[in-house]
Amino acid sequence: MTIKKSNDTSFFGHPGGLRTLFFTEMWERMSYYGMRALLVLFMTASLQTQGLGFTVATAGAIYGLYTGAVYFLGLPGGWLSDRLIGGKKAVWYGGIIIFLGHVVLAIDLQNLFFVGLILVATGTGLLKPNISAMVGQQYGDDDARRDSCLLYTSDAADDLFR
């Protein structure tokens, strides 16, 4: 897959397409770290306080599996985009799947809780490895701006909202 390299420097002296990638990455990281901050607390809260009532050990195990799945699913997500659907579609589908996962998590049914976690992890596995590759494709091979840390700034920017 090739992405059109833009000479448009409308985003802090970088290609205009970086703006979309920057904010997509920022909100994906907000989703991920926000989930990490609340997941164990929600699982261990009592049923009377609208939690799931899991033991700390069970909640910790689920948290570990979720976190591991988020990072592991980047491998098949990268393969899928390289071989079948392309990076743009992988980022798009990944974002939609993450959104649907959060919608499912908002539904007050314990049975859907795990479905929501699986959807968020799967969507992140599609989005995360591909968005980083797309940032590099915004620049020419000899463009000094290619090594900029601007994408990582989007990770830090979401800290302002947490």
Predicted features and spans:
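Intracellular juxtamembrane helix-capping segments at the cytosolic ends
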Residues: 127-139
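Conserved small/polar residues in nucleotide/adenosyl-binding loops
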Residues: 152-157
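Cytosolic juxtamembrane N-terminal segment immediately preceding the first transmembrane helix
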Residues: 2-23
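Conserved MFS/SLC helix-loop-helix module at the cytosolic interface between two early adjacent transmembrane helices
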Residues: 76-94
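C-terminal ends and interior cores of transmembrane alpha-helices
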Residues: 96-110
